[in-house]
A protein has these predicted regions:
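Conserved catalytic-core segment of NTP-binding enzymes
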Residues: 111-211, 221
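N-terminal phosphate/diphosphate-binding loop that engages ATP/GTP or pyrophosphate donors
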Residues: 28-93
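Walker A/P-loop phosphate-binding motif and the immediately C-terminal alpha-helix
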Residues: 5-41
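C-terminal alpha-helix
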Residues: 241-253
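Cytosolic-facing regulatory segments adjacent to core modules
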Residues: 78-87, 91, 96-132
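C-terminal boundary of histidine-terminating zinc-finger modules
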Residues: 225-236
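Phosphate-binding P-loop
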Residues: 1-2
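Active-site signature of alpha/beta-hydrolase-fold catalytic machinery across serine-
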Residues: 21, 25, 48, 144
Length: 253
């Protein structure tokens, strides 16, 4: 059974950055290949991990809907979907990436989605660690794209508005009865003078633990240039913070 971490947060708070650094940290700490799932149509997890997927699950879903009866001879729909999903999985340095891609258009996707959910759950079980970069509204979790999460990481920026958004996401997770072993808050981009204020705002808000990740000029430059976060130095204080956080999250559950 895999250890699954779902990362959520509103746009612009560094959700995908935290996801990418968690993938890297888990691989470097354990030596295991990590499964990275980009479940946000507006995300660029592949870019931050230094790979560009040529296929997405969304592309496959649309293709199946348009040509469901035009399949290779002797191959069932389920076999075809599973084969295409394997092709859509990109191998990287210490990780495998699967991108969900565009959201559903008009039409009935129930049968296709059921096959995809089954394949995704079975594929996740082949990995020791899975990191899912989710949509802010957690639609994939609510549709049971995955069975359960060991840790739900809610990412915020160091503002009151950001914290309030995280609070709503946590409440939403509870309302949807998503199976979560631990809820964690990550306040990203914190500068030194903000730490006491951030810690005060986070107090009593999360069931598990609150973490702060500092601001980094090097990280900001990599993001601005669209470069892989795997290039971030081992000694960078952001990466060290995420690495320490990943250790604690694993031991919480």
């Amino acid at each position: 059974m895999s250890f699954r971490i779902a990362v959520v947060g509103k746009g612009g708070v560094g959700k995908t950055t935290i996801s990418a650094l968690l993938v890297r940290a888990l691989h470097e700490r354990t030596g295991k290949v990590v499964m990275a799932v980009d479940a946000d149509p507006n995300s660029n997890l592949g870019e931050k991990l230094g790979v560009m997927p040529e296929r997405t699950i969304g592309d496959l879903r649309e293709k199946m809907l348009k040509s469901a009866d035009d399949l290779p001879a002797g191959q069932s729909k389920q076999e075809y979907v599973e084969y295409q999903m394997r092709l859509a999985t990109v191998e990287g340095d210490g990780f495998d990436l699967l991108s969900m891609g565009r959201p559903e258009g008009p039409g009935c996707y129930c049968y296709i989605n059921n096959i995809m959910r089954t394949f995704l759950d079975e594929a996740m079980d082949d990995y020791d660690f899975v990191v899912i970069d989710n949509e802010a509204g957690m639609e994939h979790l609510s549709r049971r794209t995955t069975k359960s999460m060991d840790v739900l990481v809610a990412v915020s920026d160091p503002t009151k508005t950001g914290m309030e958004t995280v609070g709503r996401l946590v409440s939403l997770a509870k309302e949807m009865k998503i199976e979560v072993g631990c809820l964690a808050l990550v306040v990203n981009g914190v500068r030194g003078q903000q730490i006491p204020v951030v810690e005060q705002m986070a107090e009593g808000m999360i069931q598990c633990k609150a973490f702060t990740v500092p601001f980094s000029d090097d990280l900001a430059n990599l993001n601005a240039e669209g470069r892989s976060l795997l290039e971030l130095g081992e000694s960078d204080h952001v990466f060290r913070a995420v690495k320490a956080m990943s250790d604690q999250l694993i031991h919480f559950v």
